[in-house]
Amino acid sequence: MTYREVFGVVLLSAASALAPVWADNFDYDTRRAPALLVCDRDSEHGRVAAARTCYQALLRSTRDGLVRAEAQWALGDVKSANDEFRALVNADARALQPRLRWGRLFLATHQYADAVKLFQEALAIDAQDKGARLAMARVMAERYDGDVRKLLATLLEEDPTLIEGQLLMARVELENGKYDAAATAAAQALKLAEQQQRAPLEAWSQLAAIELARGADTQRWTGPALAYNPRYGDIFASLAHFEVMRRRYLEASVWLRQAVQVQPDLWTAHEELGVNQLRLGDREGARVALTRAYSGDPFSATTVNTLRLLDSLEQFNFERMTQPDAIMQLHKKESAALRPYVEQLMRESMATFGKRYGYTPNEPVTVELYPDHDDFAVRIAGLPGIGLLGVTFGHLVAMDSPSGRQTGEFHWGSTLWHEMAHVYTLSVTDHRVPRWLSEGISVFEEWRTGPTPGVSLAPPVLTAFAEGKFLPVAQLDEGFIRPSYPEQVQVSYMQAGLICLFIEERWGFDKLASFLRQFTRDNNTAAAVQANFAMEPAAFDKEFTASVQKRFAPYLADPKKWLPTMQRAAKALEARDWKEASSASQQAVALLPEFTPADSPYLMLAKAQEGAGDSAAATATLLAWRKAGGWDPDGLRWLAKLLLQAQRPVEATAVLDAVNYADPLRAPGHAELGELLLTAGKAQEAVREYSVLLALDPLDTAAANFGLARAWRLAGDLPQSRRRLLEALETAPNYRPAQKLLLEMTGDPTP
């Protein structure tokens, strides 16, 4: 069976694997059957043959369905275990433990929805069951979803002897950069494991990861772990996980190679190695590791999907730029249409950030654009984040192409600019920069130097600020990694951007650049703030809060006023009450001029002004909207139309050019822009627009070729011009404009 044939197959419907497929399954629940614990001892010490014999003997000797299911799971016979768990649950509506363990089986295969359903059923049976609550905490921890720390704190306050609770708390604290708290929890887990005679391996893994984060020697903990179980590769896979969390992908691959060397049948580590090599741009290395993972676990969705993604790369063009050195991976169906704009943004961003941050890439920067969002989702598998538009792995950027989302859903040019900033902030600091600062600088650069000018944000960000939900600067990473409320990730992005803006306005850009350089060595935010700004983090937070309060004072004076004002404007527009619509829209703009999306009050105001017959006022409003950061493609096209009506072609040209970085794959705009560029004598830009127009396969190819012929003639390339004229006439032999120009060129060899 090939991986293409099993795509979409649910793992739990697989045939018997009878081999270790996932990382070790440790069950710390005191309700685990003593007979299983005997076999577990052999498994935990790496005595594979003895463990197999023990579990097989249990299957022959017991009729206890739960014990049988656990033994089948331990032997890798997932299908039989799944069937056994199902039978137990179907036989007893109040069977709590079978539900929990069945859910854990789903959790081990990353089928979170099925796992959560079973855990919720268990909680419905007993809302206070610690095993069920711990299971939900593990789901939250693995999915980076919800305030898992609060849940764990409650559980551990009730029962501090929960080994898994201490381990999860250690993981969460470590991911939040709280190394002392993580070490305390991990040490407690180790102590409890010894007291309860359970395997200390996961506790050693956590302690090793903490040592790694502190820059210390992990051998202190990996040594005892391998002495306890010479085949315990998961300790190295755990170290790799935390390196990935820190975006240190090269280091992660080193640990993953150790993991599979120690435990060759740890298929999850082979899989993660393959995924990680792809993050590093090593497609062949990725394929080797993923093929190995597939040989042991042909039903992993991540393995199968990533192998299919690698196969699909034959549908892409890989185009090399020079000066600067860069590679564009663009799908063949849209490569010709997108390349000019991608290349321009890459050149501009690399020149801009190279100067601002004092770094020249030492290897080619690669940008990958995916027209199928599902492919992009596979590309970033295993990373925390919600609704990501792009990701950066060092010198490699992957993102949705403009066709990967609905028109107007995202500004692909700003996304690319944002991600290119990450290339520089990560590289300057050798990936040590905190997530919040790297994201903050990227947002800040969108506002300051990117293709959409202006500081643009939405009311929920300021509402969160007003409610005291902005995090202290020293804790801001937590808002990205483990959000405690639904909007916190987006709020944290904006808070980070506003902090960078505050630094620039308070001390100047050079101080922001020097703050970034505080992380060229291992450092934390609190120490970096003290060193760079000569103030305690609390004092920094106080000044930043005051700056936000001042900048957004009109909105923050009464956060509940803005929405009713917007609703009043919308209602008046619908009633064609232009005066009331204008008044309400102006009030909404004044309250929050930074709100610039497609439903912004600027656009409502412009509609009201145009409805009242004042096109000049509508034009001025739309120009203000664009300056503030507005980029909705329909709004920009409307602005260009008004500018042309007002005989302002230069400004209209700039606006239509801006549309290309929001919505470049619609043909009509390129013809209009091409004509304006020809009129302005901008030959190369006109060549670009008509070339893109032809790549989009317009209905009137004769007119497009004619436009391109005129552009080439203006550029002085007469052979290209004649070639395009002949193309136009081949499509439409009676196309008089092309006939006329060809006659002119035949008689006059000069442009």
Place the predicted regions along the sequence by residue.
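Long, contiguous interaction/recruitment modules in multidomain scaffold/adaptor proteins
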Residues: S16-T30, E44, E175, G408-H411, ...
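Beta/coil-rich, acidic/histidine-enriched accessory regions frequently appended to metallopeptidases
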Residues: F26, T30, D40, R231, ...
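Helix-start (N-cap) detector for alpha-helical repeat units in TPR-like alpha-solenoids
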Residues: R32, T62-L66, L96-Q97, K130-G131, ...
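Residue-level recognition of tetratricopeptide repeat
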Residues: D40, E70, R104, R138, ...
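Register position in tetratricopeptide repeats
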Residues: E44, A74, A108-T109, A141-R143, ...
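Structural marker of alpha-solenoid helical repeat scaffolds
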Residues: S61, A91, I125, E158, ...
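Canonical tetratricopeptide repeat
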Residues: V67, R101, A135, L168, ...
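Juxtacatalytic substrate-recognition/specificity segment
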Residues: K117, K150-L151, L192, R220, ...
